[in-house]
Protein backbone atom coordinates (compact mmCIF):
# COMPACT_ATOMS: atom_id res chain seq x y z
CA UNK A 1 0.00 0.00 0.00
CA UNK A 2 1.26 3.50 -0.80
CA UNK A 3 1.61 5.63 2.34
CA UNK A 4 2.43 9.34 2.48
CA UNK A 5 4.31 9.74 5.76
CA UNK A 6 4.45 13.26 7.21
CA UNK A 7 7.15 13.44 9.84
CA UNK A 8 10.87 13.99 10.45
CA UNK A 9 13.18 11.78 8.44
CA UNK A 10 15.26 11.05 11.53
CA UNK A 11 15.00 9.72 15.08
CA UNK A 12 12.08 7.57 16.18
CA UNK A 13 9.95 9.08 13.41
CA UNK A 14 12.30 7.51 10.87
CA UNK A 15 12.13 4.25 12.84
CA UNK A 16 8.35 4.19 12.33
CA UNK A 17 8.58 5.05 8.63
CA UNK A 18 11.17 2.29 8.16
CA UNK A 19 8.96 -0.17 10.05
CA UNK A 20 6.11 0.60 7.66
CA UNK A 21 8.46 -0.23 4.79
CA UNK A 22 9.42 -3.51 6.46
CA UNK A 23 5.70 -4.32 6.62
CA UNK A 24 5.68 -4.14 2.85
CA UNK A 25 4.28 -0.65 2.28
CA UNK A 26 5.58 1.88 -0.23
CA UNK A 27 6.38 4.87 1.98
CA UNK A 28 7.09 8.43 0.89
CA UNK A 29 8.55 10.50 3.74
CA UNK A 30 7.47 14.14 3.65
CA UNK A 31 9.29 16.15 6.32
CA UNK A 32 7.63 19.48 7.29
CA UNK A 33 10.91 20.63 8.85
CA UNK A 34 12.37 20.95 5.36
CA UNK A 35 10.22 24.04 4.79
CA UNK A 36 10.58 25.45 8.31
CA UNK A 37 14.32 25.03 8.73
CA UNK A 38 15.97 22.88 11.38
CA UNK A 39 16.50 25.49 14.05
CA UNK A 40 15.89 25.69 17.77
CA UNK A 41 13.97 28.89 17.02
CA UNK A 42 11.32 26.90 15.16
CA UNK A 43 10.69 24.81 18.27
CA UNK A 44 10.66 27.88 20.49
CA UNK A 45 8.23 29.69 18.19
CA UNK A 46 5.94 26.64 18.20
CA UNK A 47 6.12 26.49 22.00
CA UNK A 48 5.21 30.15 22.46
CA UNK A 49 2.75 30.75 19.59
CA UNK A 50 1.47 27.35 18.53
CA UNK A 51 3.23 27.65 15.20
CA UNK A 52 1.75 30.98 14.16
CA UNK A 53 2.59 31.46 10.48
CA UNK A 54 3.82 27.91 9.96
CA UNK A 55 0.84 27.01 7.77
CA UNK A 56 1.84 29.68 5.26
CA UNK A 57 5.25 27.99 4.93
CA UNK A 58 4.29 24.33 4.74
CA UNK A 59 0.69 23.90 3.53
CA UNK A 60 1.27 24.25 -0.20
CA UNK A 61 4.52 22.23 -0.54
CA UNK A 62 3.30 19.52 1.82
CA UNK A 63 -0.02 19.23 0.00
CA UNK A 64 1.79 19.01 -3.34
CA UNK A 65 4.12 16.30 -2.03
CA UNK A 66 1.27 14.24 -0.59
CA UNK A 67 -0.76 14.43 -3.81
CA UNK A 68 2.32 13.41 -5.81
CA UNK A 69 2.70 10.29 -3.65
CA UNK A 70 -0.82 9.10 -4.67
CA UNK A 71 -1.30 7.47 -1.26
CA UNK A 72 -3.88 4.96 -0.12
CA UNK A 73 -3.28 6.25 3.42
CA UNK A 74 -1.71 9.34 4.99
CA UNK A 75 0.27 8.83 8.20
CA UNK A 76 1.08 11.92 10.26
CA UNK A 77 3.76 11.66 12.94
CA UNK A 78 3.04 14.13 15.78
CA UNK A 79 1.37 16.67 13.48
CA UNK A 80 2.09 19.81 15.50
CA UNK A 81 2.61 21.78 12.26
CA UNK A 82 -0.51 20.57 10.41
CA UNK A 83 -3.63 22.65 10.94
CA UNK A 84 -7.30 22.16 10.02
CA UNK A 85 -7.04 23.94 6.65
CA UNK A 86 -4.35 21.54 5.46
CA UNK A 87 -6.19 18.52 6.88
CA UNK A 88 -9.38 19.54 5.09
CA UNK A 89 -7.49 19.71 1.79
CA UNK A 90 -5.80 16.39 2.43
CA UNK A 91 -9.26 14.96 3.09
CA UNK A 92 -10.16 15.59 -0.55
CA UNK A 93 -7.99 12.56 -1.41
CA UNK A 94 -10.65 10.38 0.23
CA UNK A 95 -8.15 8.15 2.02
CA UNK A 96 -7.69 7.50 5.76
CA UNK A 97 -5.56 10.08 7.59
CA UNK A 98 -3.89 8.68 10.70
CA UNK A 99 -2.10 10.61 13.43
CA UNK A 100 0.40 9.04 15.81
CA UNK A 101 1.79 11.06 18.69
CA UNK A 102 4.09 9.88 21.47
CA UNK A 103 3.93 13.22 23.27
CA UNK A 104 0.94 14.47 25.25
CA UNK A 105 -0.83 17.17 23.20
CA UNK A 106 -3.37 17.67 26.00
CA UNK A 107 -0.91 18.49 28.80
CA UNK A 108 0.69 21.85 29.51
CA UNK A 109 4.36 20.86 29.40
CA UNK A 110 4.87 21.92 25.77
CA UNK A 111 3.17 25.30 25.94
CA UNK A 112 1.28 26.13 22.73
CA UNK A 113 3.17 23.57 20.63
CA UNK A 114 0.12 21.40 19.86
CA UNK A 115 -2.37 24.18 19.10
CA UNK A 116 -2.65 23.22 15.42
CA UNK A 117 -2.91 19.52 16.32
CA UNK A 118 -5.85 20.15 18.63
CA UNK A 119 -7.57 22.38 16.06
CA UNK A 120 -7.15 19.74 13.34
CA UNK A 121 -7.96 16.75 15.54
CA UNK A 122 -11.57 16.18 14.28
CA UNK A 123 -10.32 15.82 10.70
CA UNK A 124 -8.21 12.73 11.34
CA UNK A 125 -9.71 9.33 10.60
CA UNK A 126 -7.83 7.81 13.53
CA UNK A 127 -5.62 9.00 16.38
CA UNK A 128 -3.06 6.61 17.88
CA UNK A 129 -2.35 7.89 21.40
CA UNK A 130 0.15 6.66 23.98
CA UNK A 131 -1.86 7.56 27.10
CA UNK A 132 -5.13 6.06 28.30
CA UNK A 133 -6.35 9.32 29.82
CA UNK A 134 -5.91 11.09 26.48
CA UNK A 135 -8.56 8.98 24.74
CA UNK A 136 -11.45 10.67 26.54
CA UNK A 137 -9.89 14.10 26.01
CA UNK A 138 -9.50 13.42 22.30
CA UNK A 139 -13.13 12.33 22.00
CA UNK A 140 -14.22 15.45 23.86
CA UNK A 141 -12.37 17.58 21.30
CA UNK A 142 -14.15 15.84 18.44
CA UNK A 143 -11.94 12.89 17.48
CA UNK A 144 -13.69 10.51 15.09
CA UNK A 145 -11.78 7.50 16.36
CA UNK A 146 -8.90 7.01 18.79
CA UNK A 147 -6.94 3.99 19.96
CA UNK A 148 -4.50 3.64 22.79
CA UNK A 149 -1.05 2.24 21.92
CA UNK A 150 1.92 1.49 24.15
CA UNK A 151 5.27 3.10 23.55
CA UNK A 152 7.43 0.94 21.33
CA UNK A 153 10.99 -0.07 20.66
CA UNK A 154 12.22 -0.61 17.12
CA UNK A 155 13.03 -4.08 15.83
CA UNK A 156 16.27 -2.92 14.19
CA UNK A 157 17.43 0.13 16.17
CA UNK A 158 16.87 -1.50 19.57
CA UNK A 159 18.05 -5.03 19.00
CA UNK A 160 20.92 -6.35 21.17
CA UNK A 161 24.34 -6.14 19.56
CA UNK A 162 28.02 -6.53 20.36
CA UNK A 163 29.72 -3.25 21.26
CA UNK A 164 33.22 -2.38 20.11
CA UNK A 165 35.50 -2.43 23.19
CA UNK A 166 36.69 1.14 22.63
CA UNK A 167 33.11 2.40 22.31
CA UNK A 168 32.08 0.41 25.36
CA UNK A 169 34.92 1.94 27.36
CA UNK A 170 33.81 5.42 26.26
CA UNK A 171 30.24 4.86 27.49
CA UNK A 172 30.98 2.62 30.47
CA UNK A 173 28.96 3.62 33.54
CA UNK A 174 27.53 2.23 36.73
CA UNK A 175 24.15 4.03 36.65
CA UNK A 176 23.24 5.98 33.54
CA UNK A 177 20.48 8.30 32.43
CA UNK A 178 19.98 9.37 28.81
CA UNK A 179 17.51 12.20 28.50
CA UNK A 180 16.79 15.91 28.46
CA UNK A 181 16.78 18.07 31.58
CA UNK A 182 13.38 18.84 33.08
CA UNK A 183 12.76 20.82 36.26
CA UNK A 184 11.86 17.81 38.42
CA UNK A 185 14.92 15.85 37.28
CA UNK A 186 17.58 18.11 38.76
CA UNK A 187 16.65 17.58 42.43
CA UNK A 188 16.23 13.84 41.80
CA UNK A 189 19.74 13.53 40.35
CA UNK A 190 21.27 15.61 43.12
CA UNK A 191 19.70 13.33 45.72
CA UNK A 192 21.18 10.27 44.00
CA UNK A 193 24.59 11.95 43.92
CA UNK A 194 24.35 12.88 47.60
CA UNK A 195 23.55 9.26 48.43
CA UNK A 196 26.69 8.07 46.69
CA UNK A 197 25.29 6.74 43.42
CA UNK A 198 27.91 6.67 40.66
CA UNK A 199 25.85 8.52 38.07
CA UNK A 200 26.45 9.30 34.39
CA UNK A 201 24.13 11.64 32.46
CA UNK A 202 23.86 12.20 28.72
CA UNK A 203 21.33 14.76 27.56
CA UNK A 204 20.54 18.27 26.44
CA UNK A 205 19.75 21.40 28.47
CA UNK A 206 21.19 20.15 31.75
CA UNK A 207 23.16 23.39 32.03
CA UNK A 208 19.80 25.08 32.70
CA UNK A 209 19.35 23.12 35.92
CA UNK A 210 19.60 25.24 39.10
CA UNK A 211 21.57 22.28 40.47
CA UNK A 212 24.05 22.31 37.57
CA UNK A 213 27.10 22.93 39.76
CA UNK A 214 26.48 19.63 41.55
CA UNK A 215 25.39 17.76 38.42
CA UNK A 216 28.18 18.97 36.09
CA UNK A 217 30.81 16.40 37.19
CA UNK A 218 28.35 13.63 36.29
CA UNK A 219 27.29 15.03 32.91
CA UNK A 220 29.02 13.03 30.17
CA UNK A 221 27.71 14.84 27.10
CA UNK A 222 24.69 15.98 25.07
CA UNK A 223 21.81 13.80 23.94
CA UNK A 224 22.66 10.65 21.99
CA UNK A 225 20.68 10.47 18.76
CA UNK A 226 22.71 7.96 16.75
CA UNK A 227 21.13 4.50 17.03
CA UNK A 228 24.39 2.59 17.47
CA UNK A 229 25.78 5.00 20.05
CA UNK A 230 22.47 5.05 21.93
CA UNK A 231 22.56 1.25 22.05
CA UNK A 232 26.20 1.35 23.16
CA UNK A 233 25.40 3.73 26.02
CA UNK A 234 22.54 1.50 27.22
CA UNK A 235 24.54 -1.72 26.95
CA UNK A 236 27.66 -0.20 28.56
CA UNK A 237 25.74 0.77 31.70
CA UNK A 238 25.18 -1.65 34.53
CA UNK A 239 21.88 0.07 35.41
CA UNK A 240 19.77 2.36 33.20
CA UNK A 241 17.40 4.90 34.72
CA UNK A 242 14.05 5.47 33.04
CA UNK A 243 12.64 8.78 34.25
CA UNK A 244 9.12 10.00 33.50
CA UNK A 245 8.00 13.46 32.46
CA UNK A 246 5.67 14.83 35.12
CA UNK A 247 4.52 17.55 32.73
CA UNK A 248 3.46 14.86 30.25
CA UNK A 249 1.76 12.80 32.98
CA UNK A 250 3.77 9.74 31.93
CA UNK A 251 3.20 6.29 33.41
CA UNK A 252 5.78 4.76 31.07
CA UNK A 253 7.96 6.13 28.25
CA UNK A 254 9.86 4.88 25.22
CA UNK A 255 12.87 4.23 27.50
CA UNK A 256 10.69 1.78 29.44
CA UNK A 257 10.54 -0.37 26.32
CA UNK A 258 13.86 0.39 24.62
CA UNK A 259 16.16 -0.37 27.57
CA UNK A 260 14.98 -3.98 28.15
CA UNK A 261 14.61 -4.54 24.38
CA UNK A 262 18.33 -3.79 24.01
CA UNK A 263 19.20 -5.95 27.00
CA UNK A 264 19.80 -3.22 29.58
CA UNK A 265 18.49 -3.25 33.13
CA UNK A 266 15.56 -0.86 33.60
CA UNK A 267 15.39 1.06 36.88
CA UNK A 268 12.29 3.27 36.82
CA UNK A 269 9.55 4.86 38.88
CA UNK A 270 6.95 2.42 40.22
CA UNK A 271 3.74 3.08 38.26
CA UNK A 272 0.69 1.04 37.34
CA UNK A 273 1.91 0.70 33.75
CA UNK A 274 5.47 -0.27 34.64
CA UNK A 275 4.04 -2.99 36.88
CA UNK A 276 2.01 -4.30 33.95
CA UNK A 277 5.07 -4.33 31.70
CA UNK A 278 7.54 -6.08 34.03
CA UNK A 279 7.59 -8.14 37.20
CA UNK A 280 9.25 -6.04 39.87
CA UNK A 281 12.52 -7.40 41.18
CA UNK A 282 12.75 -10.09 38.52
CA UNK A 283 12.41 -8.30 35.15
CA UNK A 284 13.04 -4.67 36.18
CA UNK A 285 13.45 -2.67 39.38
CA UNK A 286 11.22 0.17 40.53
CA UNK A 287 11.21 2.91 43.15
CA UNK A 288 8.95 5.62 44.55
CA UNK A 289 11.58 8.32 45.21
CA UNK A 290 15.28 9.10 44.95
CA UNK A 291 15.99 7.53 48.33
CA UNK A 292 14.58 4.16 47.27
CA UNK A 293 16.20 4.46 43.83
CA UNK A 294 19.63 4.96 45.40
CA UNK A 295 19.14 1.96 47.68
CA UNK A 296 18.02 -0.26 44.78
CA UNK A 297 20.99 0.79 42.64
CA UNK A 298 23.52 0.16 45.39
CA UNK A 299 22.05 -3.27 46.09
CA UNK A 300 22.23 -4.31 42.43
CA UNK A 301 25.76 -2.98 41.97
CA UNK A 302 26.85 -5.21 44.85
CA UNK A 303 25.15 -8.31 43.39
CA UNK A 304 26.32 -8.88 39.81
CA UNK A 305 24.58 -12.26 39.32
CA UNK A 306 21.26 -10.71 40.36
CA UNK A 307 21.83 -7.69 38.12
CA UNK A 308 22.55 -9.89 35.12
CA UNK A 309 19.55 -12.10 35.87
CA UNK A 310 17.15 -9.15 35.99
CA UNK A 311 18.55 -7.68 32.77
CA UNK A 312 18.22 -11.04 31.01
CA UNK A 313 14.68 -11.66 32.28
CA UNK A 314 13.66 -8.10 31.41
CA UNK A 315 14.84 -8.60 27.83
CA UNK A 316 12.91 -11.86 27.55
CA UNK A 317 9.78 -10.13 28.89
CA UNK A 318 10.19 -7.26 26.44
CA UNK A 319 10.20 -9.77 23.59
CA UNK A 320 7.05 -11.44 24.96
CA UNK A 321 5.30 -8.10 25.44
CA UNK A 322 5.98 -7.41 21.74
CA UNK A 323 5.71 -3.63 22.08
CA UNK A 324 7.62 -3.01 18.87
CA UNK A 325 7.00 -0.72 15.92
CA UNK A 326 5.91 -3.31 13.38
CA UNK A 327 2.99 -4.91 15.31
CA UNK A 328 1.87 -1.54 16.66
CA UNK A 329 1.82 0.08 13.23
CA UNK A 330 0.16 -2.95 11.64
CA UNK A 331 -2.67 -2.69 14.20
CA UNK A 332 -3.03 1.06 13.62
CA UNK A 333 -3.15 0.67 9.82
CA UNK A 334 -5.67 -2.18 10.05
CA UNK A 335 -7.99 -0.18 12.29
CA UNK A 336 -7.69 2.92 10.13
CA UNK A 337 -8.47 1.07 6.91
CA UNK A 338 -11.30 -0.94 8.43
CA UNK A 339 -12.81 2.08 10.13
CA UNK A 340 -12.64 4.06 6.92
CA UNK A 341 -14.40 1.31 5.06
CA UNK A 342 -11.61 1.09 2.52
CA UNK A 343 -9.81 -2.20 3.05
CA UNK A 344 -7.79 -2.92 -0.06
Protein language model regions, located:
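Nucleotide-sugar donor-binding catalytic core of glycosyltransferases
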Residues: 1-47, 54-65, 69, 77-85, ...
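Acidic (Asp/Glu)-rich catalytic clusters
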Residues: 89-92
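Conserved acidic donor-binding segment of nucleotide-sugar-dependent glycosyltransferases
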Residues: 253, 284-290, 299-304
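A cross-kingdom feature marking charged/low-complexity
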Residues: 339-344
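A short, histidine- and acid-enriched strand-loop-helix "catalytic/donor-clamping" loop
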Residues: 98-111
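A charged, aromatic-enriched C-terminal amphipathic alpha-helix characteristic of glycosyltransferases
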Residues: 302-335
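Short amphipathic alpha-helix in glycosyltransferases
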Residues: 97, 175, 284, 298, ...
Amino acid sequence: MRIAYSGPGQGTSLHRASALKRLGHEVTIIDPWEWLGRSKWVSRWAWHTGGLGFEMRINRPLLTAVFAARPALIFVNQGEFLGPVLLRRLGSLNVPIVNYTNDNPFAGRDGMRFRLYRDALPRYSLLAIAREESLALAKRLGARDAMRVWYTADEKAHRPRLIDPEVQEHYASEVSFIGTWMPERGPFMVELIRRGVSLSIWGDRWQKAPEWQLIAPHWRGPGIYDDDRYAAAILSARICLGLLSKGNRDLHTSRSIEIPALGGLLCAERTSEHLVLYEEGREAVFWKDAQECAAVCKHLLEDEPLRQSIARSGHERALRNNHFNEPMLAAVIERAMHGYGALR
